[in-house]
């Protein structure tokens, strides 16, 4: 059966000043999180552990990522990167905030937030923090 599917509305392009403001606030947040989330492994530790926290832009999304080390002898690669939080630019200097669920699906909890509101939620809510 065929049905009409209207064209999707184009995503808002992120202005450079907004990108710079988000990147700056993210770096401050990640600096505060690094001592708490990046710990040296104990000798003989065989499980994945966080070695770096970073942020990156892709189209109209800003992702917070954790780089994990894989020390075990059966590891497929020595490192991998996992995204754990996402800010989606929706226009008018507003963002939707989502976290990565253990199933690999993004769960959007908050919509239409300002940059300051986004980073307040990131600081306060454990959903958005690396595991």
Predicted regions and their residues:
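Negatively charged, low-complexity tracts enriched in Asp/Glu with abundant Ser/Thr
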Residues: 2-72
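Short, charged/polar micro-motifs that form catalytic or ligand-binding hotspots
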Residues: 16, 77, 105-108
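Short, conserved beta-strand/beta-arch hydrophobic-aromatic motifs that form part
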Residues: 62-95
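Short, compact, well-ordered microdomains
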Residues: 86-131
